[in-house]
Structures are given as C-alpha cells and as structure tokens.
Amino acid sequence: MARTLQGEWMKVEQKGGQVPAPRSSHGIAVIGDKLYCFGGEDPPYESIDNDLYVFDFNTHTWSIAPANGDVPKTRVLGTRMVAVGTKLYVFGGRNKQLEFEDFYSYDTVKEEWKFLTKLDEKGGPEARTFHSMTSDENHVYVFGGVSKGGLNATPFRFRTIEAYNIAEGKWAQLPDPGEDFEKRGMAGFLVVQGKLWVFYGFATANDPKIPTLYGSQDYESNRVHCYDPATQKWTEVETTGFEKPSRRSCFAHAAVGKYIIIFGGEIERDPEAHQGPGTLSREGFALDTETLVWERYEGGPIKPSNRGWVASTTTTINGKKGLLVHGGKLMTNERTDEMYFFAVNSST
C-alpha cells in the first residue's frame, strides 16, 4: 500500500561558533531563520549551563544570545521551550540540587529575558521537570511532568494541562481529563488543527493493583487523547495501523498539517532508570489525525541512530515543513549534539 506521507532525512551541518555541548532533556524552538536551544543535562541529572544558544540556518553557526533582563539563574535540565511570534517561553526544569526554575519569556528582538510567573504558588502551575509544552497564536500550554511537591497536594506526575493566556498574562487549568487518564511525563504534546493532542509518554498506573511492564507503577504508555477547546471535551482516541508504534516516551515529535510525526524515543526504561540508556528507538511514524491511522516512514539513507530524550520542534527548512531533532541520549548513554531534519515532501 502506498504511503500517504513522504519525506526525507537530512543532517543539518553545524560549522562552529559558540556551539552548545552535547546534551539531552533540553528545549529548542525556532523563530524565523534562528534556532534557540536552552537547558539540558550531561551526565544524567547534571545540568550544563543557563546560556541561550542561537543557531543561524543561513550561516550554520552558533552564538550565545545576550543575557539581559531577568535572566534565569538556575542551570536546568528537564525544561521545555516554545516560540510564539518573536518571543520564546521557557517553563520549569531543575538542577541536581532540586532547585526548580519558574516561567520566563525571552524577547528575540529586544534580546531580553522577562520573569513571568513564580511556580509553586497557590492557584498557579506547580514547578516540574520532564513535562511537555506546545503553543498556538494566543496560548502556551504545559502538560504533565514530574512534580516537585509544592504547596498543593499533587501526584508524582501530572495529568492536567496548564494554559497561559499571552495577552492577559494569566494561567488557567483546562478541564481535568478524569481518573482514567494516565499521569505522564515526556509525552507527545501538540496543537493540531486547533485541538490539543497528548500521546504516549512515561506513565504512572492509576490502580496500584494493576501489574505493569516493569513490576512497578511506572511504564511506557501507548494511549492517545485529544482535547477540543471548542467543546472543552476530552476524547480517548483509538488509533489503528499495520505499522503502529510500540509504547514509548522521550521521543521527537512535530505537527505538519493533519499529521503527527514522531521519531525515536525510549521503548523500555533502563534497570538503572534515568542513569542508564534504556532501550532506544530509531523508528519513525506518522499519525493521520483525521483517519486515525498510523504508518511508518523511513526517509532515505541519512537517518538518525537510536536516540531518546531529544529536543524537537516543527519548523520549515528550504521551503519544506517537518520535524527538527537536536541532541539527545544515545544507546551508549552518551549525549549527542547532532541535528537532523525530516522534511515532508508530500502528504495526502
């Protein structure tokens, strides 16, 4: 059967400059012809720096953005970042000493950081790591992640979405998806054609009597959910496909049209948990959010090796939209600084 999504992998050349060290558990976002990179770890649980790195797609060189304004003080891992307009939004993360960061923006025109929200205060979002983040034109969304504890009684992982209204500068929690919804970290999280999709991720069992894949209450999930802001309703989505991805977390993902595109990820955690590499994938899959059918994609000979705990985003390079992947953890448990782009050539 002919594949409905065609594309090709390319390795993005990096010619030098102030190049970020290899890392995982960091955040990236693209504004115009610039890629921004923040946070990360190497080795496990060792945060690296608090510099904001800038990659120029025209010169293929790196630089460090000016550190003006309310610069985040903590060197963080397990953080996430998105772009809306000309601003970056960075949420959460922590260092080895369990010092957690808050919510900031960075104006790429003024080249200035701005403190936005103190996390862990009553009535607002709680501090966290290994969460997921996405955005639309008016909102920044944060899903899941691992709890610090904070002032509110909270499970070890979250199952709710926090929505930040950019114009109003206010947070609101979207409707709770219910007890059957898994609490997850490192899940896929995207806005696709106006709806919020949560898929796969590392989950905590709701019922302690339920046996899990690892003999504990933590496991890789394969469930897919969708939230419609128009109706304020959650739906668990039953997907199909001859080549359907196995359970996983910590994978790269992007939205292109009606498609959710994923790559790699952790398909089995390491016996030493985050200290080890686990079993990592180099498979690529695409979900048609209209037909709800998964299919595998290959993308030619230039394909990333097995990896997880990457940073990823949707962007356009050379006129083609696709999935950009930076850094991550390899099967050797080493971190990488490689950058790859899966360019979508056609989709039906």
Curated annotation (Swiss-Prot):
Effect of mutating residue 94 to K: Increased activity with allylglucosinolate but reduced acticity with benzylglucosinolate in the presence of myrosinase
Entry cofactors: Fe(2+)
Enzyme class: lyase
Effect in UniProt of substituting residue 269 to A: Strongly reduced activity. Strongly reduced activity
Known outcome of mutating residue 270 to A/N: Lost activity
GO biological process: glucosinolate metabolic process; nitrile biosynthetic process
Cited InterPro entries: Kelch-typ_b-propeller
Activity regulation remarks: Stimulated by the presence of Fe(2+) leading to an increase formation of both thiocyanate and epithionitrile with allylglucosinolate as substrate in the presence of myrosinase. Repressed by EDTA.
Record bears the keyword Acetylation: no
Tissue: Expressed constitutively in roots, stems, leaves, flowers, siliques and seedlings.
Reported impact of residue 153 to N: Normal activity but slightly reduced proportion of thiocyanate in favor of epithionitrile formation
Consequence when changing residue 309 to A/F: Lost activity
Residues noted as binding Fe(2+) in the record, renumbered to the chain: 266, 270, 274
Annotated site residues (Critical for thiocyanate and epithionitrile formation with allylglucosinolate in the presence of myrosinase) in this chain: 154
Intrachain S-S bonds: none
Chain positions of Kelch repeats: 1-33, 34-85, 87-133, 139-194, 209-254, 259-314, 322-348
pH dependence of activity: Optimum pH is 5.5-6.
EC id: 4.8.1.8
Phenotype upon changing residue 152 to A: Slightly reduced activity with a lower proportion of thiocyanate formation
Catalytic activity, as annotated: (Z)-N-(sulfonatooxy)prop-2-enimidothioate = allyl thiocyanate + sulfate; (Z)-N-(sulfonatooxy)prop-2-enimidothioate = 2-(thiiran-2-yl)acetonitrile + sulfate; (Z)-N-(sulfonatooxy)prop-2-enimidothioate = allyl isothiocyanate + sulfate; (Z)-phenyl-N-(sulfonatooxy)methanimidothioate = phenylacetonitrile + sulfur + sulfate
List of residues binding a (Z)-N-(sulfonatooxy)alkanimidothioate: 46, 94, 129-130, 157, 269, 309-310
More details: Does not contain the mannose-binding lectin domain present in other members of the family.
Protein name from the UniProt record: N-(sulfonatooxy)prop-2-enimidothioate sulfolyase
Organism name: Thlaspi arvense (Field penny-cress)
Name of the encoding gene: TFP
